[in-house]
Amino acid sequence: MIVKICGITNREDAQAAVDGGVTALGFIFYEQSPRYIAPEHAARIIERLPTGVWKVGLFVNVAPAEVVRIRKAAGLDIVQLQGDEPPEDLPAEGRVWKTMHVDGPLNTARMDAYRAEAFLLDTPSEEVYGGTGCTFDWSKATGTGRRIVLAGGLDAENVRAAIRQVRPWGVDACSRLESSPGRKDHVRVARFLKAALSEATE
């Protein structure tokens, strides 16, 4: 199972996650986010990361050509589209995850319109694109028949239950692991990773 920590802004937080066994790290290229990181800064962190850790870049309503440019410049493995992008705006090359904000039954026909490797299911908000720290009704995420990365308010206290109920392809945590926006609490990171990885192997 993929265990991703999103909102990485510095080398120390990235290393703490790697030390805990993380399988994917997320870098947010959305300037309105308190977890924004400039692509050139992300590239300097990414170049020191193990090749086995997936580097995921999060974008919100960015033109496909610009997404591809940043993906190459920063050394990303995966592009995560977090905004309101229509299927035709998915980059024509490379691996893509599409975020779906779950406020009711999943529209599987809409999911099928995307050429996405996986779908990240997150809590909806009228104010922000992710990072709410709030969970949603996990029953909406079951039985999709698609690769699901479960997000939205996950931490060490609830990730085991989330995995048991949803059986996702991956889990993603961000704001609940922070000491302040953009800064990870390394104890929370370690506890989350231990809980998620141990549950995934049971």
Question: Where in the sequence are the language-model features?
Answer:
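Conserved N-terminal beta1-alpha1 strand-loop-helix module at the mouth
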Residues: M1-E202
